[in-house]
Structures are given as structure tokens and as C-alpha cells.
Amino acid sequence: MLKWFIISCCLLTAISYSTYYLFTSNSWIKTVKTHTYSRFYQLIKENTKTQLDRLQEEAKLSGKSLIPPFINFDREYAIAPKYNISICRIKKSMSTLMSGVACVLYDTGKFMRNNRSILEVWSHRFCGEKNEYRRMNEVKWRMGDAHHTFKKIVVIRDPIARFISFFSNKCIFEAQKYPDRKQCYNCQGNVTCFLEKQYERFVQHSSDYSRIRPSYEDKHAAPLSWNCEFGKFLKDYKIIKLAVDPKDRKNGLANLMNVLKESNVPNSTLRFIEKSALEGETMHATYDSDAHDVVKKEIENDKKIREWLKRIYYLDFVIFDFDTTFINS
Ligand SMILES: *[C@@H]1O[C@H](CO)[C@@H](O)[C@H](O)[C@H]1NC(C)=O
Ligand SMILES: *[C@@H]1O[C@H](CO)[C@@H](O)[C@H](O)[C@H]1NC(C)=O
Ligand SMILES: *[C@@H]1O[C@H](CO)[C@@H](O)[C@H](O)[C@H]1NC(C)=O
Ligand SMILES: *[C@@H]1O[C@H](CO)[C@@H](O)[C@H](O)[C@H]1NC(C)=O
């Protein structure tokens, strides 16, 4: 009788211990769950989200709220189903070259027979609407059999370098050429004036009740994370980063070439793309470079301008892992 009593006691203790252990320490549950990839990515995303939220809280406390990330604002896709590729273009981020690349890959033979150039001005480009879509769902549908496996490519560049290029081109060069358009909110090349107005517009666009229509300036200056449906698809993208220094552009180009090579694009086509891209580089180098240098100097010398830039682009730096030394200075 005593023997049975002792055995029962031991069993009960064992059972309650293990139950207690299971319910209080759920670390084993976590381990199991992370083995499914979607959960794993979800966790990474939650970490990133927590990090972004924390940065936003800090910024708010100092009275300088950041523009929120991942607003679904602008999308431009061009596809090359033959190579299972879709390219998302971000304005002022080699977008002309990238639409040229998508066009060559879409129908290489026709492109070559017509003696077209990869760097044709956007409005005259050869493929036009033939391979271009505005929503990822449509891109998926057009990819046919590859709708689960196609590669999403995007080229991004340092947000400040992109802003300088945008501002010197659209707010100085074009604004002077077409004064009637009052482009860039009629700021006459004043960077601070532009950023104050643009910041307010981005705040409005990121509210759920936004009534304003996206302007030409909004689309060119929008944070990187507002493009390409990154809120949903960031982890699926092959991200090609351009170096800040145009002299290092060749590296960015080499990355692009590698990604295309992985997609079985033939050598001759790769060489054609590379040659055109480098020619375009020298073409651009001389074009509005004076304004470019002036804007760059202004940003370097004016902390207030850097603060505005930080409010708009800081989370881009974090999300896409760019060097924050300058923007924090
Ligand atoms: C192709 O275009 C280039 C310049 O754009 C021109 O020099 C060349 O003669 C053209 N070739 C043909 C075959 O049309
Ligand atoms: C594109 O994807 C389809 C379906 O997944 C596959 O059969 C085909 O081989 C792929 N083509 C290339 C060039 O990778
Ligand atoms: C530029 O704009 C800012 C803000 O609108 C203004 O305070 C400043 O005086 C302007 N600078 C010049 C040189 O006009
Ligand atoms: C393409 O170039 C690579 C090296 O750059 C070479 O190994 C490969 O054989 C070439 N392919 C063809 C089809 O010429």
C-alpha cells in the first residue's frame, strides 16, 4: 500500500513539474515556430518594426517627427518574362537605365533591329506600355508559370545623393527653364523652403485622410520605402545599391550584371547593357553638375537643412542600411 502511495506521489510530482515547465517556459515553442520561414521573417519584420517605432518615438520627443515608412505611394514595374524578371523603378535612381534594361530584355531582337538606345528619354522609349504595369498583382499575372518564382529587382541609391540629384535637376535646372510651372513650390532654388513644404505634404500623404493629389515633386522626392510596394514585398527584392560617389558607379553596375547573369541573360546582351550604361554615365556627368555641387555644399554647410532631410529620409537609411554618419552630423 505504502509502495503504491509513493509511486503515485512520484508520478504526480513528475506530471505537475513537466506541465509547469511547459506552460511557464515557452522557449521551446518559439524554437519550433522559427523553423517555419514565414514566421521567421515575421519575427525579423517585428524586430525592424519595433526598431523603427522606437526611432519614431525618440524623434517625436525631440519635436522632430519622422515621416513614416512603407506608405504604398508610387509603383512602376517593367517586366521581362523571358528571364523571369520584374524591375521596379524608383525615380531618380537610375530609372531611365532600368526601363531601358527591361526593354532590351523584353524583346532583345526587336530592340537591336531597330537600333534603339537604352538611355532614350523616358517619354520616347521604345517599349512604352508594352511591358509596364502599376501593380504587383498584375505583374504576377503576366509572369505566367513563373508567378511564384520570378525575381524582383530594384536599384536604390543613397537618399541624400538621390535628393541632391532630384533638387538640382527638377528644382534648379527645370525650374529655371520653365518658370511658369512654378515647379518645386516656387521656392526658386531655396532648399530649406522646399523641404519645409515637402515635409508638410508627406505628413498629409501619410495620414489616412489625405485629400491631396500626389504632385510631380512628391513622386520624385518620396522616401524610398514609399515605392515598389515595399511594405509587402521588401524581403522578396534583390536590392542593387548604387554607390554615393558616381566614380564608384561601376560597382553598382557590376552587381546589376551579376543579378542579370543569374537570370541567364546572354553575355552579348549583358555587354550591350554595360556599354550603354557607362556611356550614359559620362553623358550625365557633365549635365547640371554645377547646380549639383552648389546643392551639395549647401547641405554640408547648413545643419537645419540636414535636420529636414533627416525627418524625411532617416528611416530609409535604417531600412536599407545606408551609412548614417553624414545625416547624423
Ligand atoms: C544606329 O544609330 C546610330 C546613332 O544613334 C547611328 O550612328 C548608326 O548609323 C545607326 N545604325 C543603323 C544601322 O541605322
Ligand atoms: C522561368 O520560370 C519558369 C517557371 O518557374 C521556368 O520553367 C523557366 O525555366 C524559368 N526561366 C528562366 C530563364 O529562368
Ligand atoms: C529660404 O527659405 C527659408 C524658409 O522659407 C527662409 O527662411 C530663408 O530666408 C530663405 N533664404 C533665402 C536666401 O531666401
Ligand atoms: C559568358 O562569359 C563568361 C565569363 O564572363 C564565360 O565563362 C561564359 O562561357 C560565357 N558564355 C558564353 C555563352 O559565351
From Swiss-Prot:
Statement: the UniProt record of this protein carries the keyword Transmembrane: yes
Keyword Membrane found: yes
One annotated Gene Ontology cellular component of this protein: Golgi membrane
Residue spans, topological domain Lumenal: 24-329
Disruption phenotype: The tm576 deletion mutant is lethal. The ok625 deletion mutant has reduced levels of 4-O-sulfated disaccharides, but increased levels of 6-O-sulfated disaccharides. Increased mortality in response to oxidative stress.
Any Pfam family matching the protein: Sulfotransfer_2
Positions with a binding annotation for 3'-phosphoadenylyl sulfate: 91-97, 157-165
Record GO biological process: chondroitin sulfate proteoglycan biosynthetic process; positive regulation of response to oxidative stress
EC number: 2.8.2.5
Bilayer disposition of the protein: Single-pass type II membrane protein
Catalytic activity line of the entry: chondroitin beta-D-glucuronate + n 3'-phosphoadenylyl sulfate = chondroitin 4'-sulfate + n adenosine 3',5'-bisphosphate + n H(+)
GO molecular function annotations of the record: chondroitin 4-sulfotransferase activity
Tissue: Highly expressed in the head and tail of hermaphrodites, in particular in amphid and phasmid sheath cells.
Main location: Golgi
Record keywords: Carbohydrate metabolism, Golgi apparatus, Membrane, Signal-anchor, Transferase, Transmembrane, Transmembrane helix
Cysteine pairings via disulfide bonds: none
Role, per record: Catalyzes the transfer of sulfate to position 4 of non-reducing N-acetylgalactosamine (GalNAc) residue of chondroitin.
Similarity-based family: Belongs to the sulfotransferase 2 family.
Protein name: Carbohydrate sulfotransferase chst-1
Gene that produces this protein: chst-1
